[in-house]
Regions:
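Short functional hotspots at interaction and active-site rims
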Residues: 1-175
Length: 175
């Protein structure tokens, strides 16, 4: 048995400067009109950890995740938040399995576990990312600096009760 408070789920997601709301409302009989960006946009990668009480170690990367950037994230952002006995859970993305990942996490006194392949429903941070992206669509930021700042603000908006509900939804008892 494990204590859900010791679990730290990490994952990454991409966002871009062309994110807009996908649906809208207006009075019946009136056409809904909104501005939608077209042309070139920039994509960034956001990676973070989710504990039962908070989102931790948020990091924005201008570009795709690779082995070097993932190791840098672990060493600079995630490991300082880990406590002895924590269990770091992540999916089986190839960059999560490069040499040194397990050693960095275990040196902090934590354990590493991989989720089964094709099982986003077992990772509660997926629910948090869904909410984050909905807020990003609403904000419709068009530059990388503004998008990064908005992500930083939004990561502080996840309440302890909300994080616990993501854990329950994914099947992890909130003890």
């Amino acid at each position: 048995m494990f204590d859900a408070a010791r679990l730290v789920f990490i994952d990454e997601t991409s966002t871009n400067t062309a994110m807009v709301r996908l649906r809208g409302r207006c009075p019946r009989g009136i056409r809904l009109i909104d501005h939608v960006p077209h042309g070139h946009w920039k994509t960034i990668t956001f990676i973070a950890g989710l504990r039962r009480r908070a989102m931790v170690a948020p990091f924005v990367l201008d570009g795709p995740m690779n082995a070097i950037s993932f190791m840098a994230y672990l060493q600079r952002c995630l490991v300082p938040t880990l406590k002895r006995g924590d269990i770091v859970m992540m999916d089986s993305l190839p960059v999560h399995k490069v040499a040194g990942v397990r050693e960095v996490i275990e040196a902090a006194g934590a354990r590493l576990r991989y989720l089964p392949k094709y099982s986003p429903d077992l990772n509660p941070i997926e629910q948090a990312f869904s909410k984050l992206k909905a807020h990003l669509r609403k904000a419709a930021e068009r530059t990388i600096p503004r998008l990064s700042r908005r992500i930083g603000v939004l990561t502080t908006k996840f309440s302890p009760d909300e994080c616990a509900s993501y854990f329950r939804h994914a099947g992890y008892a909130s003890t």
